[in-house]
Amino acid sequence: MPFVELDTSLPAGRVPAGLEKRLCAATAAILSKPEDRVNVTVRSGLAMVVNGSAEPSAQLLVSSIGVVGTAEENRGHSARFFEFLTKELDLAEDRIMIRFFPLERWQIGKKGTVMTFL
């Protein structure tokens, strides 16, 4: 059950319409997870500094069970997320940062319990 949060300093008018759905589909493909398990949030117009600069930028946070826990996995994921984000947001790679957080089943609540018991 991946959780993906995209924060960007781009104003809402510069964020392509439907980006959240395309990011959901891309995340499912990149992480080999069913699209109906992917959760996406897109926040635009934020005051941000990336690499010491306030030029337009984005930060992606990817949290998931079992697929973001190694450097080897994340190197491949990073390449594919960067390809998607640079195209969609028209930002250079040095204006985008990605953070990967592995989750355990007990850290995700759903249906009044945690994923461990579902």
Swiss-Prot record:
Keywords: Acetylation, Cytoplasm, Lyase, Melanin biosynthesis. The modification N-acetylproline is found at residue 2. SUPFAM superfamilies: Tautomerase/MIF. It is found in: Cytoplasm. The keyword Cytoplasm applies. It catalyses: D-dopachrome + H(+) = 5,6-dihydroxyindole + CO2. It is an enzyme of class 4 (lyase). Its EC number is 4.1.1.84. The modification N6-acetyllysine is found at residue 33. GO terms for biological process: melanin biosynthetic process. It holds the Pfam family MIF. Coiled coil: none annotated. GO terms for molecular function: D-dopachrome decarboxylase activity; phenylpyruvate tautomerase activity. Signal peptide: none annotated. Its main location: cytoplasm. InterPro entries: Macrophage_inhib_fac, Tautomerase/MIF_sf. One of its GO terms (cellular component) is extracellular space. Belongs to the MIF family. Tautomerization of D-dopachrome with decarboxylation to give 5,6-dihydroxyindole (DHI). Homotrimer. This is D-dopachrome decarboxylase. It comes from Bos taurus (Bovine).
